[in-house]
Amino acid sequence: MRTTIEVFTFKIRKHRTSDFLSFADEPDLYELLANDENNFTNFIDTNLTGDIEQAQRTVRIPQKVEGYSFHHHNNKARYICGIIETGLYGKEYEIANKDDPKNVEFRVGKNSAIIKPFFYYIMIPRTGDKGLMILERTDNDGIYPLMRIILTSFINYHYGVENGYTVEKTNLILNYYLNELLEGKYNSISVSANSLKKDIADRY
């Protein structure tokens, strides 16, 4: 299993306009995500736990365990981060022992999903209109479509559904830094990662 990260910048556009939400405006989106009574994780837990039909995923927020929380925020750096648990459904398949694939141990139905934990990081500056999102990806399983649905729902809940805000992303590395490299503004780009623990639960 190969785990990577996806890095995006994103803007929030008002429906049928070219206007983007300014992070300098009130209410402060970061404060809503991090510190509001109905903050990002509480909003998911209360309003979106279960079937997200548009993404064909089920979603849940992992609960706190004694001495540890799966969700964090930093008011100075203006970011939230944590773990969201989700799984795809809609396909039937079999689960078998790797050494004896003819011996079927479980059959997964179309309404069942294998729940996996995914890391997320969202940073909202106090000025401008461009935020940063970092998401974990496992093999071909990424959660940006799900996070886009959740973040769009959260924003429209707080800012008014009549505004019809949508989230628009740009791949940060390919579309920005690669162009800067090609234009000669950088000599090189280095990407490094520490080794990952085999047990995904031990990585956070």
Where are these regions (language model features)?
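Long, hydrophobic/aromatic-enriched structural stretches that serve as scaffold segments
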Residues: H72-D141
